[in-house]
UniProtKB/Swiss-Prot annotation:
First-level EC class: ligase
Gene behind the chain: fhs
Keywords from the UniProt entry: ATP-binding, Ligase, Nucleotide-binding, One-carbon metabolism
Keyword flag Nucleotide-binding: yes
EC assignment: 6.3.4.3
Keyword Nucleotide-binding: yes
Membrane-spanning intervals of the chain: none
Signal peptide residues on this chain, from the entry's feature table: none
Superkingdom: Bacteria
Official protein name in the record: Formate--tetrahydrofolate ligase
Known catalytic reactions: (6S)-5,6,7,8-tetrahydrofolate + formate + ATP = (6R)-10-formyltetrahydrofolate + ADP + phosphate
A Pfam short name: FTHFS
MF-aspect GO terms: ATP binding; formate-tetrahydrofolate ligase activity
Organism of derivation: Roseobacter denitrificans (strain ATCC 33942 / OCh 114)
Amino acid sequence: MAYKSDIEIAREAKKRPIQEIGEKIGIGSDDLLPYGHDKAKVSQSFINSVQDKPNGRLVLVTAINPTPAGEGKTTTTVGLGDGLNHIGKNAMICIREASLGPNFGMKGGAAGGGYAQVVPMEDMNLHFTGDFHAITSAHSLLSAMIDNHIYWGNEAEIDVRRVQWRRVVDMNDRALRQITASLGGVANGFPREAGFDITVASEVMAILCLAKDLKDLEKRLGDMIVAYRRDRSPVFCRDIKAQGAMTVLLKDAMQPNLVQTLENNPAFVHGGPFANIAHGCNSVIATTTALKLADYVVTEAGFGADLGAEKFMNIKCRKAGIAPSVVVCVATVRAMKMNGGVAKADLGAENVDAVKKGCPNLGRHIENLKSFGVPVIVAINHFVTDTDAEVEAIKSYVSEHGAEAVLSRHWELGSEGSADLARKVVEVAEKDSANFAPIYPDDMPLAEKVQTIAKRIYRADEALMDKKVRDQLKLWEEQGYGHLPVCMAKTQYSFSTDPNLRGAPTGHSVPVREVRLSAGAGFVVVVCGEIMTMPGLPRVPSAENIHLNEDGQIEGLF
């Protein structure tokens, strides 16, 4: 049987005017700033007006460690949101925006897949409502003001060798990773080494996604450390007096974007921080607003549960004062087989033994998620090659680990295919059995926070930190940053720092290479291994196959 591509399905969508989607959740047309007919921003005045309403229930969708076989986390998030509406619940979806760089790099973009998508897909994967351009502009303004400050006398006494603030562009461009700036003579400033990151790696992006309102946004921007003096004391963004103008540039970008699913259900698509050097979740303002408008809000966190879900619980929930009622962990038969040692080319053949062998990775994630005091449901994202025996093997394993697995066919059937999963989510959520708590307190020393995650989530024997790292953490504690959560930056492919070590390894250690203070965002980044903040394009980038056809439609985006 031939299946339609995601783009073919998206183009056949019977979209409703965005004002109708807003009315479904109580947003009047006067409180929407339309961008065309099918997307709009929600006004700050409306957001302020609903703050006294009670919260709905929050559902987090996460997954096992990602494999090349693909797990379908966003697809499941969208499918579950549609499924909840299908069974009569008032539900919303909250996901991240797409970055241009990856869309033109490894593969085209998407917002879900099959019959579980958010539309307009093409717009969302290109310029959308301009949020990323605004973030890039605000970041670039600060870059320009730092060098301008140095040029006109350097009142803040910035050590030009210790400028921390790199430039950004929303593109994969390895040639810009390390550059020399201000060449060409005295009129162009003081030459120094610099570099570019991709926009989603910017601390401005992380701040926009954690700020509660514009006032909080401006304060956080001012708190960013941009450089150091010769005495190693920090220079803040507020010392350069850039935070006010940056806030002006970000004023509209702070407003959540309202779009719809293929089944005309409401979705907020807002923000998109990296899931390694930042927290990998959509914006706090979108999530908290959705909780005031819907009975159920379905959101996701980047990569596997050891990265995205851990940061969602320990960083986003802590900062925003929210808590999930239930967590859905997405797994696939294909991924279990790959964890069980089957090559990608052989995943289509039935192999129940390999499924069983690969299940401990899923079991580890279930145990970790439960340690936050939240009930866990496993969603088996169905692929057409799955057999009944393979699905039963996963269900049996999950049952032995004190959870329940539900087969979901949303990719193929839309909300009808996810109705069983939706019913199970409602059944569990309405028991109100969640007793959520982060796995470490604010006042725990920073080094102990790192050790706690390494031992309890990664099941390592220890995190290896040399004297330089420990001294830096102690210094930040003395400077008043000891209460901050830690944001672990490591490979997403394994519980360990070795991307090839699959399954549920124990007895390993987590080497900490460096630590970085994101004072504005409000967390300490703990770098374990190499961190790529500016990706490169592959040998054959997807951009080579993206073009307009004779009808002016985009081809090759997905």
